[in-house]
């Protein structure tokens, strides 16, 4: 029997110390990594529930274990809410991550050696869109498209590559692209060569759910996403589709289980259900609108301070700061800003002369600060402080001044009140 009063602090003080330190870091540092956000206490409560104890291989109403009547309720709630959120008629909430959701789509619809056409990681794509170091680039013949000199997706190049290589699947989506994607154009290109259109909307799923970014579900054969990032849920993955035929649905269902996964993480699925309910609330739309306003305020301020934003600005939650020609690398900029309690990530930019371990860019995003309550003026201030540090990355006095300002701002907007 486990006594209910045992806490991590008393049983495992070493781990408790690390958790406490991370909790304090999240309160004291401003979070600008575009793929990070804060979950609600309700989501965390679900993840910490006794649902973690339950094995539930299979799907609601069709399990390989007994005793699943209550976890069936949790998973069905997640499925129904997810369908409502995106106007989907198919939803799978079992993928453990966005990468595994993507893997499921590839394995369901392709054979090893088939050609896929995806966005280059160096130009804003994702590892799982055909990067050579990823399984998607090893198991499949991955052809990569990129952006033009203006930092925009070159749809003519995408079409030319599709006509030349005849991919079985066209992959649309990104990890570092700040403009609106023309999903209809991608579908037209895919149709020209008889390919599937697969969209990974992990970064913009929350914006799509709120109607502030175009939905790919009207155009794609299948769509995946993570459930954290702009959706503000637990870390996990989903697969959705609209108008999918029965054969496609069967392939997707059977590849997630038993194809690539065994038992689903029922406590995480419960957390997803909570997050989807939160995303259906009226306030979620206002939150996502503010995310975009904050990103635009930040990007415009950085441009005014002499920093180049790839594509010239942003229409979503993120921006990519191009520092080619600057004296500071992405790696050094990340470190200097970290000392000032501003958390960012270094990122390669198009035609980057530096290695991916050093880079000439920074990726910034506003989902987390917007969750804290930041509005445009706060992000203007933040962008000016970022520019101050980037202008003098080795000046301890500047870093100390910015750190003090950031600390005051964080106290004004606590993560958890």
Curated annotation (Swiss-Prot):
It catalyses: (6R)-5,10-methylene-5,6,7,8-tetrahydrofolate + glycine + H2O = (6S)-5,6,7,8-tetrahydrofolate + L-serine. It comes from the Bacteria. The keyword Cytoplasm applies. GO terms for molecular function: glycine hydroxymethyltransferase activity; pyridoxal phosphate binding. GO terms for biological process: glycine biosynthetic process from serine; tetrahydrofolate interconversion. Keywords: Amino-acid biosynthesis, Cytoplasm, One-carbon metabolism, Pyridoxal phosphate, Transferase. Its cofactor is pyridoxal 5'-phosphate. It is found in: Cytoplasm. Pathway: One-carbon metabolism; tetrahydrofolate interconversion; Amino-acid biosynthesis; glycine biosynthesis; glycine from L-serine: step 1/1. Disulfide bonds: none annotated. The keyword Signal does not apply. Gene3D superfamilies: Aspartate Aminotransferase, domain 1 (3.90.1150.10), Type I PLP-dependent aspartate aminotransferase-like (Major domain) (3.40.640.10). Pfam families: SHMT (PF00464). The record marks 228 as: Plays an important role in substrate specificity. (6S)-5,6,7,8-tetrahydrofolate binds at residues 121, 125-127, 355-357. Its EC number is 2.1.2.1. One of its GO terms (cellular component) is cytosol. Coiled coil: none annotated. The modification N6-(pyridoxal phosphate)lysine is found at residue 229. Homodimer. Belongs to the SHMT family. Catalyzes the reversible interconversion of serine and glycine with tetrahydrofolate (THF) serving as the one-carbon carrier. This reaction serves as the major source of one-carbon groups required for the biosynthesis of purines, thymidylate, methionine, and other important biomolecules. Also exhibits THF-independent aldolase activity toward beta-hydroxyamino acids, producing glycine and aldehydes, via a retro-aldol mechanism. This is Serine hydroxymethyltransferase. It comes from Stenotrophomonas maltophilia (strain K279a).
């Amino acid at each position: 029997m486990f006594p209910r009063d045992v806490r991590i602090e008393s049983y495992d003080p070493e781990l408790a110390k690390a958790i406490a330190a991370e909790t304090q870091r999240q309160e004291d540092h401003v979070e600008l990594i575009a793929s990070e956000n804060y979950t609600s206490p309700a989501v965390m409560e679900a993840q910490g529930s006794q649902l973690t104890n339950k094995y539930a291989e299979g799907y609601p109403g069709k399990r390989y274990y007994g005793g699943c009547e209550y976890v069936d309720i949790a998973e069905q709630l997640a499925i129904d809410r997810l369908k409502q959120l995106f106007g989907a008629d198919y939803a799978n909430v079992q993928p453990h991550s966005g990468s595994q959701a993507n893997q499921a789509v590839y394995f369901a619809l392709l054979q090893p050696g088939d050609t896929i056409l995806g966005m280059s990681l160096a130009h804003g794509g994702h590892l799982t869109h055909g990067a050579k170091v990823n399984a998607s680039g090893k198991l499949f013949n991955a052809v990569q498209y990129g952006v033009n000199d203006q930092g925009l997706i070159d749809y003519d190049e995408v079409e030319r590559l599709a006509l030349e290589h005849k991919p079985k699947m066209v992959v649309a989506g990104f990890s570092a692209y700040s403009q609106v994607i023309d999903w209809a154009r991608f579908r037209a290109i895919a149709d020209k060569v008889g390919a599937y259109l697969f969209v990974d909307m992990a970064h913009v799923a929350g914006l799509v759910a709120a109607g502030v970014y175009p939905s790919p579900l009207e155009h794609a054969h299948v769509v995946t996403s993570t459930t954290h990032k702009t959706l503000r849920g637990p870390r996990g993955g989903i697969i959705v589709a609209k108008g999918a035929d029965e054969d496609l649905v069967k392939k997707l269902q059977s590849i997630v289980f038993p194809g690539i996964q065994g038992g689903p993480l029922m406590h995480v699925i419960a957390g997803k259900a909570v997050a989807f309910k939160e995303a259906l609330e009226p306030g979620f739309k206002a939150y996502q609108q503010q995310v975009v306003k904050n990103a635009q305020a930040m990007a415009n301020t950085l441009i005014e301070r002499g920093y180049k934003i790839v594509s010239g600005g942003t229409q979503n939650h993120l921006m990519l700061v191009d520092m080619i020609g600057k004296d500071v690398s992405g790696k050094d900029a990340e470190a200097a800003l970290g000392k000032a309690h501003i958390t960012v990530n270094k990122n390669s930019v198009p035609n980057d002369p530096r290695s991916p371990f050093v880079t000439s860019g920074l990726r910034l995003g506003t989902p987390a600060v917007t969750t804290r309550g930041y509005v445009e003026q706060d992000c203007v201030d933040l962008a000016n402080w970022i520019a101050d540090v980037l202008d003098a990355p080795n000046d301890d006095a500047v870093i100390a001044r910015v750190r003090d300002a950031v600390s005051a701002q964080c106290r004004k907007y606590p993560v958890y009140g």
